[in-house]
Amino acid sequence: MVTKFSVWRDQAEYRIAIARLRGVRRADLDQNDLFKARQELQVYLATRAEGARREEARIALRECEEKLAESEYLIGEFYRIIGQHFGALLHYELAITNYPAAKYTVEAERRVDELARASKSETPPKPAESAPTAP
């Protein structure tokens, strides 16, 4: 049994977070386990200053955040494909804002630029300022 004062607690807290992270098969389907894994890894790093697995926990936290960025990007792709540009932009922006170091952030920024260019080219021409008068 692992108690608050157990010598195994450090290892147990790390392994619980890693098990949750490794259990995620597809980042785009369910973010709940990714959010829980991230939280557990952050708690481990915050409370285990002398933890034996700190470096592995940092690496796992980066992996977790990469998967969360991937999730936001893929959800944005879904919305873009079905023509819901507002939803696409929302999820691309979440990837960019929440996970700036992730590789999917670059792709999300590229998609935001593409959608911005597309929306500019789709805007209707402005009406004439003054209508011609009839003779």
Give the label of every model feature segment.
Residues 1-135:
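Acidic, polar-rich low-complexity tracts and alpha-helical solenoid repeat scaffolds
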